[in-house]
Amino acid sequence: MKFMHISDLHIGKRVNDFSMLEDQAYIFDQIQSIIMQEKVEGVLIAGDIYDKAVPSAEAVQLFDDFLTELAAKKLPVFLIYGNHDSPERLAFGADLLKHSNVHVSPVYNGKIEPIIVEDAYGELAVYLLPFLKPAYVKHAFPEAEIGSYEEAVSYALSRISVDTNRRNLMVAHQFVTGAAVCDSEELSIGGQDNISASLFADFDYVALGHIHGPQHIEQETVRYCGTPLKYSFSEVNHKKSVTIVELKEKGTVELTTVPLIPKRDMRKIKGTYLEVTSKSFYENSNTEDYLHITLTDEEDVPDAMGKLRSIYPNLMKLEYDNKRTRENQSIDQCGEMEEKSPLDLFQEFYTLQNNQEMTEEQNEFIKNLMEKIWEDM
């Protein structure tokens, strides 16, 4: 059976105060066309449907239109809520949607029942695992000892009976250890929300959401499809796409990606004011793109933002890179260091190196060690 795997639609998102709704509607039309071209037989949507727990009316209408068009194609749709979504709002009307072959993960209550579909190779079980926090699993199983995301997801999966003799597909929205991240994602401090890819060993394909760059983790069949659009300038080098996954006989999974072409790209450009405003500089590019411009002029250009927007109307961000800004940056960094104690600096270094903060015991040990060093000097 051939599926399209998409995730992290973030409908209603604003980037630097620019609404992305028009761009999202454009890319959704493209996705619908790809579904027809690729002869897709089912659609997997791995969470973060909306950008906010309480989406705007326009965002809800756009997703309603998208789902309605999918349902009109008589395709089964499988979707879960992500960390940006409201579980209760997204699950509203789930029983009614089933009649249109749209399967929505309910608010997590400890039960995850497979949805069985059939094709020429037999039965295929689809499991919908919505975004889980330790508190969600603890609420469903008060007796369980759960302190981490790893323990929460592991416990939730242990309550599922998986028949490994048939094909099994999982749709999930978590941060799997090893994923490359970018600025537009919301992750827990210190890597506390990491889970291991090995938790999904029983599944033939794991359709992941949460991470915005397309990538696989440890093996090709544990995959983040990425966002359909760029949502921050840390994503400028991403090649956005949809993932097409075909599960044939047990053990045979074929993966391809189909590129998505946005209405407006997100790009960075750099140069002097005269360079970036020269017609020869921009005449072969889309001036409607969302831009981050860095000017290298030594002197500030009066009303640079307004002037540049006469050429690049969707200029989102403007900054300078010159001798003055580099000196100021160096002074700021030195000033910050001078104001901090050796213990503060060591704590920052430890956090940077280990991606987690020091414990109270470690803090006390370093503090005592520093005091001893000062006494011996």
Region roles according to the model:
Residues 37, 42, 247-377:
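Accessory, non-catalytic peripheral segments of nucleic-acid enzymes
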Residues 197, 204-262:
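A conserved active-site cap/scaffold subdomain adjacent to cofactor or substrate pockets
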Residues 55, 84-218:
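His/Asp/Glu-rich metal-coordinating catalytic cores
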Residues 35-39, 119-120, 162-165, 285-286:
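Glycine-rich phosphate-binding loop signature in dinucleotide/nucleotide-binding domains
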